[in-house]
Curated annotation (Swiss-Prot):
Keywords noted in UniProt: Glycogen biosynthesis, Glycosyltransferase, Transferase
The protein's name in its UniProt record: Glycogen synthase
NCBIfam families for the chain: glgA, PRK00654.1-2, PRK00654.1-5
Family statement drawn from the similarity comment of this UniProt entry: Belongs to the glycosyltransferase 1 family. Bacterial/plant glycogen synthase subfamily.
Pathway, per record: Glycan biosynthesis; glycogen biosynthesis
Gene: glgA
Magnesium as UniProt keyword: no
Amino acid sequence: MISAAVEPHVDAFKPDNREPLTPDFATTGKAPGAQRQHNPNKRKILFVTSEIADLVKTGGLGDVSAALPRALAHLHDVRVLIPGYRQVMESDNPIHIVGELGGHAALPPCKIGRMDMADGLVIYVLICPELYQRDGTPYGANNGRDWPDNHIRFARLGLAAAEIAAGEGKIHWTPEVVHAHDWPAGLAPAYMHWRGLNTPTLFTIHNLAYQGVYSRGCSPELAIPEHAMQQEGMEFYGKLSFLKAGLAYSSHITTVSATYAREITTPEFGCGLDGFLASKAQQGLLGGIPNGIDESWDSATDKHLQHNFSINDWEGKARNTQEVRELFGLDDSEGPLFAVVSRLVYQKGLDLTLGVADYIVEQGGQIAIIGRGEPEEEQAMRELALRHPGRIGVRIGFNETDARRMFAGSDFLLMPSRYEPCGLSQMYAQRFGSLPVARNTGGLADTIECGVTGFLFNESTVESYREALSRAFYVYGKKDLLNAMRCLSMTQPFNWCQAVEPYARLYEDLVKQTQLSHY
C-alpha cells in the first residue's frame, strides 16, 4: 500500500568475553526490536538484499535479512533496502514515498518508499513496477524460469544502494556502512567503488554457487566500466559475475560459517573462485560469522505445534511423532522416524538419501519428506514413497507449520548436503529434539557436535552415510542416551546474540579504517 595453495588465515570472528551488550539480550537471546534504546554511538547501516522474510522469502537469505537487523537494533540504526516486488507492494504495511532516483544507461528511474514495521525496523522499498511488480518469485516466473532481465533488475538494486550512500534520493539518511547480501546485491559495492565513494562496504556470501553470471555484452546497459572487466574485477571466465563484483569491490567479505569460509578457498568448494578468495583470506579480508535462529523455535511455546514439550516433559514429542505419521500416511511403528525438510536439489545430497532409504526401512525406520525443487528430484522422491508404502511418505511443496511439526515429531533429521554454507534446518531440528544425521561440511560441522547433539559423516558416499545412520539406530535403541542427546541439542545457544557482537565490531572496524585512511 502506498501513500503519498598456502593455508589461508580465515578469521572466524568468534564472540569475545567482554561484558554483555545489554543484560536482557544477553540472557534471553531476544532481539529487542520494538524496544529500541537511544544510543548516541549508533552507526547507520544499510542492508541490501533481494528478500526479507517479513515480506518475501525463498530461503535462508530472507530469514537472515529479517532477523539480523533486528538483533543489531539496540547497537546500530540498521535499515533494509529491498526491491518493490508485488508481494511487498501488496503487503498490509503502508509505504510512504520518501525519495526519487534518476535513470542511468538501461537502468530506469525509480522511487524510494519507506515501510515502518511494527517493531521499528525501517525498510526502504525500491519502487519500479516495470522491473519488480510481477507474479512469481524474486528471481523468476511461476514456471521456474529466471526473468530474462534479472541483470537489469538487480543492477538497479545495487545502483540504488550506491545512490543512497551518495546522499541522492533526498531520503535524509546516509549510511556509514553498506552491507550487501549475495549476488543480487553484488553490484552495490561495485557502483560505490566506481563512483569514488568512501563509505565502507561489507559483502556476505550466503551461497557461493549462485553467482549472477551474465554476458559481457550486458556491460554498457548496466553502466559497467571497461576496466571492471578484468580478472581482479568482476570478469569471470569471459563473462561478468555480480557475485564476483561484490567480492572484488567490498571492503570486507564474510560467509555464514567459519568452516564454509575456509572451504570456499579450496577447489572443491570454491566454484571457480577459490584462488580469488584464498587471496582475500590471506589479506585478512575474509571471515565467517554464523547465523542464528529466531526465538520462536522453542518446543515449549511454539504456536505451530498442537503438542508442546520440553526437556522435562517428553509426552508432547511422542504425540507430534504420531501426528507426523498420520500426515504422511505412515504405519504405526516402534522404530525411529527420520525427516527430510529440504529444497529438492543436487546440493542437498538427496541422491545419497535415495541410496540409504532401503537400509533405513530394513532397520525398522521410516522417512517423512517435505520440500520442492528440481522436477527430477521431486519425481525421485515420489517413486521412493511408492516403493515403500507406509514406511516412506512424501509431500511436494512447503508449509511452515508442517515443517515445524516434522522437526518436533521426528527422531532424526537427514542432511547429507554436498556443501552447506550455514544451514538452518539442523539448528531448528536440534531445538525440537530431532538429532541431525549430516555431512561434515560448512555450517553443519560448526553447529553439530558429533556423538553429542547429532551424527556427522565425512564423505559424500552411501557407505559413509550408512555408517552414521548405524550410529543413530544404536542410540535410538538406548533411550537414556537418546534423551540425553536430545536434552543437549535442545539447549544449544543458536540465538542471534552469537552473531551480534562480531558484526557490531566489524562495522566499527570498517568505519574506523576508512576514517584513518583519510588522515
